[in-house]
Amino acid sequence: MHPMLNIAVRAARKDRSPSRLGKDVLAICALADCVFLGLHGADGEDGKIQAALDLLGVPYTGSDYLGSAMAMDKAVAKRIMDSNGIRTPAWRELRYTEADIPRLCEELPVPCAIKVVNGGSSIGVQLPDTREELSSALRDVLRYGDRVVVEEKIYGREMTVPVLGASALCPIEIVPPEGSSFDYVAKYQSGSAAAAEICPAPIGEEETKLLQETALKFHRALGLAV
């Protein structure tokens, strides 16, 4: 949980609990015939809720706890991509402290992408282009966690492919505002700061087929619900 969100949740609860789950929520879920999961972020996407429902013997929609946990962990997901021949930017996993930053600034390539392994919504993501930017990026990312993935920075169009059941749906092209990346603001704000999402993506049949096949292959490798 983000530190500021933790503080806000505690302040809103009489018992000062940091839990984002309401009182007796698991007891309520235990009464359900099936739980429809529409959760986003930590606890909802990382398999924790799914594991709790499994312990209660309550069926739910979507992927199970293991697939969710592996997909949420970028380092685990990258290893699965590598072992299944799915192309992904060159990468390495790091666990570091403030004291390691000077050494890492000498070792790591720039430009690069730095991502907290279990983050989402582009929180804890930095895209340094110079050694000076790399130093400040490594310090900033430490606010969200000390375990990160450092990737080769690649350039091109960004696509996402939804998977429903056993079918890959139409690829969607994501077009951030000019001069920006697909960051938190571009994902969730409206107006000129928002990214455009074009569906179906303006690409050919061959590219569409390749994207859909890759999405299904990755889903199956992770054990996600397909």
Label every model-predicted segment.
Residues 22-29, 68-157, 209-212:
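Active-site nucleotide/adenylate-binding loops and adjacent lid/helix of ATP-dependent enzymes
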Residues 41, 220-221:
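Serine-dependent amide/ester hydrolase catalytic core
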Residues 222-226:
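Short, intrinsically disordered, charge-balanced linker/junction segments flanking boundaries
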Residues 129-213, 218:
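Phosphate-binding site of ATP-dependent enzymes
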Residues 41, 122, 177:
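Glycine-rich phosphate/pyrophosphate-binding beta-alpha loops
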Residues 1-66, 70-72, 76, 83, ...:
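ATP-binding N-terminal substructure of ATP-dependent carboxylate-amine bond-forming enzymes
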